[in-house]
Design a protein with these regions (language model features):
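Histidine/acidic residue-rich metal-binding segments in metalloenzymes
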Residues: 12-175
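Metal-cofactor-binding active-site regions of metalloenzymes
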Residues: 1-12
């Protein structure tokens, strides 16, 4: 089980992680919300690290990605969809991992969906850093063109990516 690293996942106050761990939590996360204040985030990660726990991060720049439906592309523009560049994922990953590395917490990047993020994680792992990653089945099976006809059930966070990102993840998932 996972538990919220900050109270009400608001990113303002650190949860009582040791009590949550005693209650059965094996990992901590802030869900789909990033912790914007780096001082609070680092303190929370230090606390999780002191418990030899895992932090699961949702990699995206929250403000860049808030309320969007698609990845920035010609397709999204043609459809008139609000969008975010796929680099928002890499921005979130790099920021979060920098703080995770400072705290020496075990870090899991949830739902990696782009080639650039995958390559960054591969680089960090080659340096012996404490990082793992995952993706979602949606991002392995579908791409941004699947939202045609405004299929709202494909409104995901992170949004569906290009076919080339999807194929890259499929070809390299074993890494």
């Amino acid at each position: 089980p996972t538990a919220a690293i900050t109270k009400k996942v608001e990113g303002k106050e650190i949860s009582e992680l040791s009590f949550l761990q005693d209650a059965g939590a094996v990992a901590f996360t802030n869900g789909l919300k990033s912790i914007e204040n780096p001082k609070i985030f680092l303190r929370a990660l230090n606390y999780a690290s002191s418990l030899d726990s895992l932090f699961i991060g949702h990699c995206e720049d929250y403000y860049f990605s808030e309320g969007v439906s698609a990845t920035s592309s010609a397709f999204a523009t043609k459809m008139g969809l609000s969008s975010t560049p796929k680099e928002a994922e890499l921005m979130g990953l790099e920021r979060d991992f920098l703080l995770a590395d400072l705290s020496e917490v075990n870090y899991h990047a949830a739902q990696i969906t782009t080639k650039k993020s995958f390559l960054k994680i591969k680089e960090l792992k080659s340096l012996g850093k404490k990082i793992t990653a995952g993706t979602s089945i949606h991002h392995l099976l579908f791409d941004e063109t699947d939202i045609k006809n405004y299929r709202t059930f494909f409104k995901l966070r992170p949004p569906l990516r290009s076919n080339s990102d999807k194929l890259y993840l499929l070809q390299n998932i074993k890494d």
